[in-house]
């Protein structure tokens, strides 16, 4: 299997560089970025509280199995799947003084660094893609329970991504982080965040854009978010 793929002029790549979409190029970038930020926000939440918004966790987890998504938003089921991420993009880019937003931003930067290393390892990409394919088969034919799938995805992360030179340090409540279930959730979210970071880069996103296009990114995320159902403070949908 070839991973998260698309086609352009008969060539194939690991990321969706050629998705057909009704969204503008900037909107597509922001949707992918929302996937990164959403994963980062939930990593922080699980690490600190042991809780997470199930609907958005499910959307992030399922994005790992979107090998042939026809559009950017379809990677997450639909754009509603990254509603929390869109709001979090605005939070991260407009309020750098909030402690939770700072932590979220640190995870985002870490995921982008991790993706940069992952992107240079086609051998690792093939292993991750193959093993995710096996987990996806299990989800389709046996159990699709998100927590059970997270345990399998966590093992993939430990066997592959955790061996890259850069390591993301997760900070939170030791009591929560020592629980196997929460550790699995965190690793699953980190891999989902890396997946979105890969997509973001394929769509033209670059870390320097936070500095030079931060206002535009936040405004675009806000506009997209306003078109969707509201999200409560704990991350759930109304």
Predicted regions and their residues:
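Conserved mixed alpha/beta catalytic, RNA-binding, or beta-rich assembly cores of soluble enzyme
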Residues: 42-43, 52-58, 116-119, 131-134, ...
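Leu/Val/Ala/Ile-rich N-terminal alpha-helices, chiefly Sec-type signal peptides and the beginnings
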Residues: 14-84, 91
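Non-transmembrane, amphipathic alpha-helical segments
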Residues: 21-35, 71-74, 96-103, 120, ...
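Conserved binding-pocket/active-site segment within a compact domain
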Residues: 137-206
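Short, hydrophobic/amphipathic alpha-helical patches that form generic packing surfaces
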Residues: 31-45, 106-117, 188-200
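Long amphipathic alpha-helical segments with strong coiled-coil/leucine-zipper propensity
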Residues: 65-145
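Alpha-helical oligomerization segments
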Residues: 185-238
